[in-house]
Amino acid sequence: MLVKSLQTCKICGAENTRGNHFGVQCCRACAVFFRRRAGTKYLRLKCLSVHCGEAARFCKPCRLKRCYEAGMKIEYFQHNRDSIKSSSIAQIPRSFANIVGRPSLVIFCVPQDSYQKTFVDLNSLVGKASEIFTAGPESPYIGLTQLKKLATFSNCSKEWAQTRFKTISHGEMSYFWEFYFLRTAKWLTYFDEFQRIPDEIKIKLLLSFWHVFARLDKLITTAKARKLKLCSQQTWAMSNGLILDFDRTKVDFSDISNYPTEDLFYFLNSITALDLQPQVLELMELEVSDMEFNFMLAQLTFSYAGKRFQGDILKICDRFQEVLSNDLHEYYVKEMRTPRYSGRLGKIMKINNAIQNDIWKNRPRGELAAIFNVFKVEFSHPEMFIDTGFVRN
């Protein structure tokens, strides 16, 4: 039988030690003692007991001295190994009172305008949209279905150059507004049913859902760009080739608000679509075609407008959706040879519903921003920015 030799502690002489501690073969008691007393006042003290050393008993100064003489080193101490932190850094809870700088006792008082607001005249932009509706589609296309005509305008499958913004201010933001507003108008000219309605309803619908169009367009383009590894998980891509990295891009909104930029994103969360990262992953997995993409755009925008206005506009939007739904059915059955497409269509509708739910969820934030004058801008057409965070609904 093999007998394992017992090792003694080099500090106190105890038998059957439990291994090497801080560079020395010792017992656990001496290891714990050194961990607690190393670097303390006992280094400077002299022996405290006349019986020190008897029966392997040492006073604290002598025991600590023997630890150092045996070769124990504080450099072997290990820190921050606890799975649960023993203490946490206290932070001031985030609240609306902290953001607007008003105490909760008076938070429900509607303040007066404390500064001059910047007026944004959108008449020229709306005029351009009217001209686009009058001129009709840029490249007339005789398609079998209206959904195919819409798909001819979409450049979802085309390559696009990458341009990264280093700084975003109110100037760049107004460029985004103009791009998506006019892009939505041009897209609508390819829909024959839309071209048949009165001009005033065309403008009313465009003013209401251009930003909804922009949300889905950004999600689709971002999914495609990430699939091609053209941008990272922290960046967002637009269909005009621009890439936004909120971790690296400097955002300056000082011209439209007196509040810190990091607080403004709370109110602009709906239009930035930062909550829709899971939907981007779903779109990457689905790899929607141009036909499906345009159906998603139409269903999302017309459904949003119908719920917002009700009445006759709801009937018009329902008719639009019915026409395009029939076209999508024909696309699946005749072109894709997929008569059982309910599963894929269900995933597509789930994404659209998530976008609409995100809009409804963030709507109260826009109400708060308007009540407490978070943004110092005033628009000639405020209905254009409902559900964006800039104006009150």
UniProtKB/Swiss-Prot annotation:
A GO CC annotation given for this chain: nucleus
Task: Give the top-rank taxon of the lineage listed in the UniProt record for this protein.
Answer: Eukaryota
Q: Which Gene3D superfamilies match?
A: Erythroid Transcription Factor GATA-1, subunit A, Retinoid X Receptor
User: MF terms per GO, please?
Assistant: DNA-binding transcription factor activity; sequence-specific DNA binding; zinc ion binding
Question: Residue ranges of the NR LBD domain?
Answer: 121-388
> Which residue stretches are annotated zinc finger (NR C4-type)?
9-30, 47-62
Location in the cell reads: Nucleus
Where it mainly occurs, coarsely classed, is nucleus
The UniProt keywords, alphabetically, are: DNA-binding, Metal-binding, Nucleus, Receptor, Transcription, Transcription regulation, Zinc, Zinc-finger
Q: List the disulfide bonds.
A: none
Tell whether Lipoprotein is among the UniProt keywords: no
The record, for PANTHER family, names: NUCLEAR HORMONE RECEPTOR FAMILY (PTHR45680), NUCLEAR HORMONE RECEPTOR FAMILY-RELATED (PTHR45680:SF35)
Task: Supply the name of the protein.
Answer: Nuclear hormone receptor family member nhr-90
Whose protein is this, by species?
A: Caenorhabditis elegans
